[in-house]
């Protein structure tokens, strides 16, 4: 267990944070995904937050982070989402048309404290992209008639 310290404080504050683009749109591919990763990493370094594990999926972001006790989680997530939105729109101006001028991320987020199960959460985040791809493959079968094996479009056979 890694224990950090401030002047008169010993701390070990780890959090699993999940947030998504507005309308849960799948936009994090290729160059945009890399830019989001770079931006989030840079913003975390500015605040002294250590990223233990992170995964950017097409429609959401998982982060396992270590936040100093001098920063509240809600402040940090607000800072991360607010600043990253401005920087993403600066690099990818075309996204403003999909999301409006100031809203890239949806309003809410999920946060959970991490105790002794940090390794399990780290593994979960590492496997998240694989799990999403498997789920997408499963949903592809919903559009195939189970009796004939032929594609189905809006309840009708082609």
Where would I find each of the regions flagged by the language model?
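Basic nucleic-acid-binding interfaces
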Residues: 1-158
